[in-house]
């Protein structure tokens, strides 16, 4: 069974866009190392803390969209809100 890693963009995009946005989450699997699968979900800013059970962490990518090998990957779990 794959273990998914959730990383969140390290800035408050809600304050820049408004009360509703498309927020992209990046799922990593331990078996694939830095391979990236991107999934976009539509959320409201008021639900961000409810949807994401973790603080934002810095994410670093190289010029072609791959995460850097020196990056520390932390494990998070998504709480799926009943919306």
From Swiss-Prot:
Which superkingdom? Answer: Viruses
Its recorded name reads Uncharacterized 9.5 kDa protein
Species of the source: Vaccinia virus (strain Copenhagen) (VACV)
């Amino acid at each position: 069974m794959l273990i998914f890693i959730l990383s969140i963009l390290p800035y408050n995009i809600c304050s820049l866009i408004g009360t509703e946005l498309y927020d992209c989450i990046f799922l990593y699997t331990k078996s694939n190392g830095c391979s990236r699968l991107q999934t976009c979900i539509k959320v409201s800013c008021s639900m961000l803390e409810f949807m994401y059970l973790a603080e934002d962490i810095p994410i670093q990518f190289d010029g072609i969209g791959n995460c850097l090998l020196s990056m520390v990957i932390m494990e998070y779990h998504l709480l799926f809100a009943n919306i």
